[in-house]
């Protein structure tokens, strides 16, 4: 793939986000993205930062593997250092999830709780967006989310816009390299972040 093509494609996505915000009847003042330490959320958050609009990135660990959490914190730090329009907030969600599962202990179901983690994150993203006159920007790609349907309904699928919805995983990796995403993130095998 030619470098110019990758750059042009990234700019098309950046312009698309800006055009969406400019043409929406509700004029969003911020873009809110949950970051996991994976390539999809890293690319989307970097595209958002490149719009020049206020970009709020949230790390929301719930029983998360330390290496994934470390990658998300590293990416957030990189974004803040590179883009003056980026804010990062670490929202520890273990207590919220523990309270949720304690209240519902007689309805214990591992898969249900895994999906509930994604739904708690979605509710958090929308609360932050509401408090900042923003929109929630999704991180789903063409193959996993919009092809196979590998997402949590009303969880990570609950977003306002999905800039990489038409990108294959290979294209997401290409954009990540072009945008300067850390090799540690690019080389990490994808996970769903649910377990």
Task: Show which residues each predicted segment covers.
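Catalytic subdomain that performs nucleotidyl-dependent activation
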Residues: 135-195
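ATP-dependent adenylation/nucleotidyltransferase module used to activate substrates
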Residues: 1-150
């Amino acid at each position: 793939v030619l470098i110019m093509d990758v750059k042009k494609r990234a700019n098309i996505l950046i312009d698309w986000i800006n055009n969406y915000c400019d043409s929406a009847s509700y004029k969003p003042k911020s873009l809110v993205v949950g970051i996991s330490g994976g390539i999809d959320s890293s690319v989307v958050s970097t595209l958002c930062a490149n719009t020049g609009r206020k970009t709020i990135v949230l790390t929301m660990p719930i029983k998360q593997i330390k290496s994934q959490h470390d990658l998300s914190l590293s990416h957030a730090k990189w974004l803040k250092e590179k883009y003056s329009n980026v804010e990062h907030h670490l929202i520890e969600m273990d207590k919220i999830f523990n309270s949720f599962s304690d209240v519902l202990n007689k309805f214990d179901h591992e898969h249900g709780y895994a999906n509930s983690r994604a739904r708690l994150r979605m509710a958090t993203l929308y609360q932050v967006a509401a408090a900042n006159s923003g929109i929630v920007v999704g991180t789903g790609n063409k193959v996993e989310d919009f092809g196979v349907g590998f997402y949590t309904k009303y969880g990570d699928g609950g977003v306002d816009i999905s800039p990489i919805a038409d990108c294959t995983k290979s294209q997401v990796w290409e954009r990540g390299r072009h945008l300067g995403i850390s090799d540690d993130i690019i080389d990490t095998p994808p996970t769903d972040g649910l377990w």
